[in-house]
Amino acid sequence: LVPERELIVGRMDGVIYGAAQLQKPSRNNEAQSFAVQLMHLFVAPYARGHGLARMILRKAEERARALGFHVINLDVRASQTSAIALYEAEGYQRWGTHPVYARVKGQIIQGHYFYKALK
């Protein structure tokens, strides 16, 4: 639907329980043409614990490689410790922290930035 985005869905028994998006760089951004942004990786709370997030992440990496990208970038709230553990276990490197990344229920939350070089 949107040329700059790729949607990856995770299913169990034919039902969609999670998804992620790959956002390609804009066409006029030649300097970043080798990198794609992973966004909105989500698994429904009642479907967690079955490895679906890892499967979606790996499918996103596979699709990024197929599209010719060499790097995946992502960012995540510091409070999302399960997601951070997944990214680190899958080889993503944290390269920075934003001290005022998000506001959740009136609280300021830090955010972390990660990247992974695709082989």
Place the predicted regions along the sequence by residue:
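Conserved phosphate-binding and hydrolysis motifs of nucleotide-dependent enzymes
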Residues: 14, 18, 51-53, 91
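Conserved GNAT acetyl-CoA-binding A-motif
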Residues: 57, 64-75
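C-terminal "cap" of GNAT-fold acetyltransferases
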Residues: 70-73, 77-84, 89-93, 100-119
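Active-site acidic-Proline motif in GNAT/NAT acetyltransferases
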Residues: 44-46, 50, 78-79
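Conserved amphipathic alpha-helical interaction elements at protein-protein interfaces in regulatory
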Residues: 49, 62-66, 93
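Non-catalytic, surface-exposed connector residues within folded enzymatic/regulatory domains
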Residues: 32, 50-51, 108
